[in-house]
């Protein structure tokens, strides 16, 4: 039997990149999926591919994570179709990267905060009663940008570190409800990173040299399968943790 047979997993930003890799990993273990994002065509394409390849059901919903009402609608549709929620994965995030802190505007900070920590906050609150029923789990995505203070990432890092703090408190408060809350900090090869590699090959090679394993993570195999573990019974005693999937870069105690 597959580890997540007939589970229901919500993945924000599930139509591309890391989110789609996670979707593939969960589908391979038998979980039905709810994929959210801002581009309908991308979500529909993801649904068709996943259902054809893995034989699971996928509900695609266009939703902006900064819109609380849109998130309420996502959960309403999820319960109407599947009747339960086992895992919530807050993966989506929008931000302006590459700007020094002194060049960030309030609008830049708002963009990161609303699409990041507010989205995670809204989703977690509305999913709580359903996760309590299933003794489910939350997997929130943060970043090495905050953990290691990477230049040019101040608004993004602020949002991601806020998500880590929110997650630790939720792990404490929701433990008695049987809900586990963990954080993943990935360093994965995505579509945008592939473009960056092509446009800046020398900078890419310099970056790779700082990763002891010598590569970026694969979204499905290196990120998605760890998320499957965190959502499964194998991780039943794991909560409040930050899992750094960075290939050894930024080693910390």
Question: Where are the model-predicted features located?
Answer:
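Short, small/polar-rich loop/turn modules that mediate ligand/substrate recognition or access, typified
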Residues: 175, 180, 238-240
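Catalytic Tyr-x(3-8)-Lys segment
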Residues: 202-221
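Substrate-binding pocket helix/loop in short-chain dehydrogenase/reductase
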Residues: 99-101, 105-113, 207
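Residue(s) in the substrate-gating loop at a strand-loop-helix junction
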Residues: 143
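Short C-terminal tail/terminal secondary-structure segment
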Residues: 98, 148, 239-253
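Conserved glycine-rich cofactor-binding loop
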Residues: 13-17
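Active-site helix of classical SDR
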Residues: 124, 159, 167
């Amino acid at each position: 039997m597959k580890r997540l047979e007939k589970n229901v997993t919500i993945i924000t930003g599930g139509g591309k990149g890391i989110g789609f890799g996670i979707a593939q990993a969960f589908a391979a273990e038998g979980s039905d999926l709810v994929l959210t994002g801002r581009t309908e065509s991308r979500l529909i394409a993801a649904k068709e591919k996943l259902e054809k390849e893995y034989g699971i059901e996928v509900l695609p919903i266009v939703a902006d994570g900064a819109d609380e009402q849109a998130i309420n609608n996502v959960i309403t549709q999820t319960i109407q179709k599947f009747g339960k929620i086992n895992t919530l994965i807050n993966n989506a995030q929008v931000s302006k990267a590459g700007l020094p802190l002194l060049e960030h505007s309030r609008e830049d900070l708002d963009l990161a905060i609303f699409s990041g920590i507010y989205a995670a906050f809204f989703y977690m609150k509305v999913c709580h009663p359903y996760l309590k029923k299933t003794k489910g789990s939350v997997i929130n995505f943060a970043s090495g940008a905050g953990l290691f203070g990477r230049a040019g990432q101040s608004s993004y890092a602020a949002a991601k570190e806020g998500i880590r703090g929110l997650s630790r408190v939720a792990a404490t408060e929701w433990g008695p409800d049987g809900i586990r809350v963990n954080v993943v900090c990935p360093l994965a090869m995505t579509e945008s990173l592939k473009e960056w590699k092509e446009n800046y090959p020398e900078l890419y090679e310099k970056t790779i040299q700082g990763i002891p394993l010598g590569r970026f993570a694969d979204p499905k195999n290196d990120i998605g399968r760890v998320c499957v573990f965190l959502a499964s019974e194998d991780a039943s005693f794991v909560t409040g943790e930050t899992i750094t999937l960075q290939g050894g870069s930024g080693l910390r105690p």
